[in-house]
Amino acid sequence: MFILTMGLNHHTAPIDIREKLVFKESEEEMALVTLQQEKSILENVIISTCNRTEIVAVVDQIHTGRYYLKRFMANWFQMDMEKIEPYLFFHEETDAVNHLYKVTAGLDSLVLGETQILGQVKHAFEIAKQTATTGTLLNKLFREVVTFAKKVHHHTKINENAVSVSYAAVEVAKKLYGSLDNKKIVLVGAGEMSELALQNLAGSGIADITIINRTKSNAELLANQFQAKVGAYENMNEHLMLADIVLVSTSAAEPIIKQAAMQDLMEQKASSMLVIDIGLPRNVEHDCSYIPNFHLYDIDDLAGVVSANSLERQRIVLELENTIEAEVRNFFEWEKQLGVVPVIRALREKALDMQEVTMTSLENKLPGLTEREYIQIGKHMKSIINQMLKQPISELKEMSVEEDATTSIEHFKRIFGLSETDVTVIEKEQAETRS
């Protein structure tokens, strides 16, 4: 079994490609099940966010695994494999695990150290677990990765004052207008990104904020937190006519701000308008950028502002990379030890069988034993067995991560009289449990 990651992100693919390869939340479970049915795929988790679509899989062979992951992606999004292949990356084994640690801790994000990705990875794992597309390896890996990322954010504080996409949006507005005093802003969407934008706008001098959302109650909840107004979704263009700055972040699958409508609007509008689209797929038609006085920015346009990270935070990243390498080594040592689990179980079962035979013999030879005495003798005998096996089992685990592990394990089985049949029976039981 091998761990293989395939994906595309803000490093490898522009936004016009990424927005075509996003798994809809309503289709997550179906995508997981469909991928699980592909040849070579033993386990899988799909992570799909505004900046990345990645699949973490356990495969029986690397080469065939790569092919079937690509085929699944092409079939799911109804695109030619040759069209998406140039934007894909692959990580195998240690590189795949290392990458997942960095992603979950926010070290690979457009926003260094951001915490949103931790929740997204955790959500992706929970959905996969509920859908039964994870097993022994990915269950262990994702639990370790999520725990590590939580510790990173708690102990290093890398997320404190982290430059966010929403922060970058506000900085772009300041560069265009200078002071934001008396500027009118319209937020289209009432999700997490809109809330982050409002937090960054606090204290910037903007007093006139209108929130527009298809579900009005969500807009009202957000407006109450930030003393903003609520506008009717059906009257969006009327609000845009009065706006200086528009920030758009919705989960719509298609653009909600169209070029034709904006062309008419800008011909009537007396002033310029800054429109920042942080949706993925994009919420504003790209052709709007050609309209005079319509200043359009998308997520990739904000990357330059976001990349201005402090030296202190970059120092933390270097330190974390060493820690991550140690975590990765620990994971693969654990994986190697999985191979001796059937041997350990076979050894324990053989010892318990011997105990049972001995207790039966004792009962026959000492019929006068009370039930309490019989139970006490059994407990003491089991304790002796556990003490006797503790050191050999510990040594076996150590041997399992050494170069000549196979030879050492065979010697161990011979010493304790464990046949191939003893071990194979346990292995079959484990396989049936996983399936």
Swiss-Prot record:
Record: residues binding substrate: T49, C50, N51, R52, S109, E114, T115, Q116, Q120
Species this chain originates from: Listeria monocytogenes serotype 4b (strain F2365)
Protein name: Glutamyl-tRNA reductase
Highest classification ranks of the organism: Bacteria, Bacillati, Bacillota, Bacilli, Bacillales
Class of enzymatic activity (EC top level): oxidoreductase
Domain notes: Possesses an unusual extended V-shaped dimeric structure with each monomer consisting of three distinct domains arranged along a curved 'spinal' alpha-helix. The N-terminal catalytic domain specifically recognizes the glutamate moiety of the substrate. The second domain is the NADPH-binding domain, and the third C-terminal domain is responsible for dimerization.
Gene Ontology MF terms: glutamyl-tRNA reductase activity; NADP binding
InterPro entries for the chain: 4pyrrol_synth_GluRdtase, 4pyrrol_synth_GluRdtase_dimer, 4pyrrol_synth_GluRdtase_N, GluRdtase_CS, GluRdtase_dimer_dom_sf, GluRdtase_N_sf, NAD(P)-bd_dom_sf, Shikm_DH/Glu-tRNA_Rdtase
PROSITE patterns: GLUTR
The family this protein is said to belong to: Belongs to the glutamyl-tRNA reductase family.
CDD domains (UniProt xref): NAD_bind_Glutamyl_tRNA_reduct
Signal peptide bounds: none
GO biological process, one term: protoporphyrinogen IX biosynthetic process
Binding-site positions, NADP(+): G189, A190, G191, E192, M193, S194
Domain of life of the native organism: Bacteria
Alphabetical keyword list: NADP, Oxidoreductase, Porphyrin biosynthesis
